From Swiss-Prot:
Its EC number is 3.1.13.1. Belongs to the exonuclease superfamily. Optimum pH is 7.0. The lineage of its organism: Eukaryota, Metazoa, Chordata, Craniata, Vertebrata. SUPFAM superfamilies: Ribonuclease H-like (SSF53098). GO terms for molecular function: exonuclease activity; exoribonuclease II activity; metal ion binding; U1 snRNA binding; U2 snRNA binding; U3 snoRNA binding. InterPro entries: Exonuclease_RNaseT/DNA_pol3 (IPR013520), REXO1/3/4-like (IPR047021), RNaseH-like_sf (IPR012337), RNaseH_sf (IPR036397). It catalyses: Exonucleolytic cleavage in the 3'- to 5'-direction to yield nucleoside 5'-phosphates. This is Interferon-stimulated gene 20 kDa protein.
Length: 181
């Protein structure tokens, strides 16, 4: 993964679709390496929303009024991801919601970075939440709003964790994941 490429962090929020409440994309946020928002839109998923999952997703019926259609949003998002290192937490769910093959992208996933886990003194865990990593390494609390998660907040947090991982790698003489401005 070494080399020079632009880095973008992504986080998506999903709602339940149909009788089985399968995940459908309802919001996507992208930020650059400096935390500036590149993309943040509510997205009208294909099909009937049967569970807004507001407590977690932060998405309400009002957000769907005038929301960008899934097909349009998907093209916009994939264009922004093209050729970049994509940073996120448990990205497989985001790419599934985008109906996109994650293997077509170069990714950095905070949920699988053992260097971060060790730095946070969590190397005994099987799975680490973004909230716990942020508490331990960024010394800040996220995902604690009664209104649900913010995909912008989560994307910014994963970008900060990526930068911590880069510093750990540099300190230990390990190859960096990507070099960006």
């Amino acid at each position: 993964m070494a080399g020079s490429r632009e880095v973008v962090a992504m986080d998506c929020e999903m709602v339940g679709m149909g009788p089985r409440r399968e995940s459908g994309l309802a919001r996507c946020s992208l930020v650059n390496v400096h935390g500036a928002v590149l993309y943040d839109k509510f997205i009208q998923p294909e099909g009937e929303i049967t569970d807004y999952r507001t407590r977690v997703s932060g998405v309400t019926p009002q957000h769907m009024v005038g929301a960008t259609p899934f097909a349009v949003a998907r093209l916009e998002i994939l264009q922004l991801l093209k050729g970049k290192l994509v940073v996120g937490h448990d990205l497989k769910h985001d790419f599934q919601a985008l109906k996109e093959d994650m293997n077509r992208y170069t990714i950095y996933d905070t949920s699988t970075d053992m260097l971060l886990w060790r730095e946070a003194k969590l190397d005994h865990c099987r799975r680490v939440s973004l909230r716990v990593l942020c508490e331990r390494l960024l010394h800040k609390s996220i995902q604690n709003s009664l209104l649900g998660h913010s995909s912008v907040e989560d994307a910014k947090a994963t970008m900060e964790l990526y930068q911590i991982s880069q510093r750990i790698r540099a300190r230990r003489g390990l190859p960096r994941l990507a070099v960006s401005d």
